[in-house]
């Protein structure tokens, strides 16, 4: 997951994902078949483009992408942490769906 800055994941996360997924792809697809879910936390907007960018790493690595009942995003500021009821419900559903995939 990522906080959203300027409608994109932060640079440190992108650099990490670039290195990790490049290394995995050159060593026989280490992440192939492993389920994954992207999550974004933002104040107002930019979460969709952030989730899209993170999901591309999963797609290119042949990883099943686990979804929820809505976009995997939370709308909170640091001082309001945990107050986004719809976002919290979305995360709970995402957790249930991830468990269901992992138990198969």
Question: Where are these predicted regions, by residue range?
Answer:
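Glycine-rich phosphate/pyrophosphate-binding loop and the adjoining helix
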Residues: 59-104
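Helix-loop-strand module that forms the ligand-binding subsite of alpha/beta enzymes
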Residues: 1-64
């Amino acid at each position: 997951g990522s906080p959203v800055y300027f409608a994109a994941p932060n640079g440190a996360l992108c650099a990490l994902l670039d290195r990790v997924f490049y290394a995995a792809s050159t060593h026989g697809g280490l992440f192939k078949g492993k389920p994954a879910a992207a999550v974004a936390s933002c104040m107002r907007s930019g979460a969709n483009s952030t989730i899209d960018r993170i999901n591309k790493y999963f797609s290119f690595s042949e990883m099943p992408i686990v979804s929820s009942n809505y976009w995997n995003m939370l709308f909170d500021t640091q001082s309001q942490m945990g107050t986004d009821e719809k976002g919290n419900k979305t995360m709970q559903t995402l957790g249930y769906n991830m468990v269901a995939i992992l138990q198969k």
